[in-house]
């Protein structure tokens, strides 16, 4: 069961909360009529236990059990610093 854990990579937008970060996940979707690829952004709250992230960092997050009303993702690693 633990081999199906979803992981995503995104950019940190905010680290103003204690032990929490806001991560922007970008994906490309194709317009149904015109075929142009458009960028769509999803904002996800993730748990950052050591408060090690800063705004602009590229991070990897993974899905976990719900930690609060809006947090169900946790930080795995900081890929690159801002």
From Swiss-Prot:
PROSITE patterns: RIBOSOMAL_S17
Domain of life, source organism: Bacteria
Annotated Pfam families: Ribosomal_S17 (PF00366)
InterPro entries named in the record: NA-bd_OB-fold, Ribosomal_uS17, Ribosomal_uS17_bact/chlr, Ribosomal_uS17_CS
Entry keywords, A to Z: Ribonucleoprotein, Ribosomal protein, RNA-binding, rRNA-binding
UniProt GO molecular function: rRNA binding; structural constituent of ribosome
A GO cellular component entry from the record: cytosolic small ribosomal subunit
GO biological process assignments: translation
Family as reported in the entry's similarity comment: Belongs to the universal ribosomal protein uS17 family.
Subunit comment: Part of the 30S ribosomal subunit.
Function: One of the primary rRNA binding proteins, it binds specifically to the 5'-end of 16S ribosomal RNA.
Name the record gives this protein: Small ribosomal subunit protein uS17
Organism: Shewanella piezotolerans (strain WP3 / JCM 13877)
């Amino acid at each position: 069961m633990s081999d199906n854990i979803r992981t995503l990579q995104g950019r940190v937008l905010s680290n103003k909360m204690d032990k929490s970060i806001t991560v922007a996940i970008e994906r490309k979707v194709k317009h149904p009529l015109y075929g142009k690829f458009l960028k769509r952004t999803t904002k996800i709250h993730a748990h950052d236990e050591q408060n090690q992230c800063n705004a602009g960092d590229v991070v990897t997050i993974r899905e976990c059990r719900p930690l609060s009303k809006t947090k169900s993702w946790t930080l795995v690693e900081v890929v690159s610093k801002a």
